[in-house]
Amino acid sequence: MAERGSDIRPGHILEHNNALYLVVKVMHTQPGKGGAYIQAEMKNLKTGAKQYERFRTDGDIKRAIVDESDYQYIYGDGSMITVMHLKTYEQITISKDILGDKSIYLQDNIVITLVFYNGEIISAKVPDYVTLRVIETEAVIKGQTVSSSSYKVAMLENNQRISVPTFIKPGDKIVVYTPDDSYYERAKG
């Protein structure tokens, strides 16, 4: 679908130079001379290569028409995972690589979104927020207080290390913001 360059947003999938690109970051730039443009950081969905591209704000871009469907993770077998469509209960096996480095968030019954283009899976997304248990944390350095903005490193149940506030202790459940793999909050309940 044709749109203007000023309509580009992170998460959009564009058809550009005979390939599909996921828009990762967008910055609007108004130079002193000349017309405004959009500087977009994009990821080639086939090769995974990052690329920076400038689009005129009044220029045409072609947004890919994609379908998204939610699937529940059932189990993993090495480099492959089996997922089930939430409405039709159809089970399919796909490569874990489609999730990239976000495959560490796969856990029983998590719902992932598969993105289809012309009937073919082109990408997959985990939820933005995932709850995980803290397995171990670094010791708090004397002088650090709960009210200070200091952090310590924690190991999570998926063997991921992230920075957490000093009041988090082993056994706590925390919410992780998956787009940047950061601590979001202590899980409620």
UniProtKB/Swiss-Prot annotation:
Its GO biological process terms?
Answer: peptide biosynthetic process
Q: In which pathway does it act?
A: Protein biosynthesis; polypeptide chain elongation
The protein's location, in the record's own words, is: Cytoplasm
Keyword annotations: Cytoplasm, Elongation factor, Protein biosynthesis
Q: Which GO terms describe its molecular function?
A: translation elongation factor activity
**Alphabetical list of SUPFAM superfamilies matching this protein:** Nucleic acid-binding proteins (SSF50249), Translation proteins SH3-like domain (SSF50104)
Matches recorded under Gene3D superfamilies: 2.30.30.30, Nucleic acid-binding proteins
Coiled-coil stretches are none
Describe the family membership recorded for this protein in Swiss-Prot or TrEMBL: Belongs to the elongation factor P family.
Summarizing the function annotation, the protein's role is:
Involved in peptide bond synthesis. Stimulates efficient translation and peptide-bond synthesis on native or reconstituted 70S ribosomes in vitro. Probably functions indirectly by altering the affinity of the ribosome for aminoacyl-tRNA, thus increasing their reactivity as acceptors for peptidyl transferase.
Among NCBIfam families, the record links this protein to: efp, PRK00529.1
What is this protein called in UniProt? Answer: Elongation factor P
Show the taxonomic lineage: Bacteria, Pseudomonadati, Pseudomonadota, Alphaproteobacteria, Rickettsiales
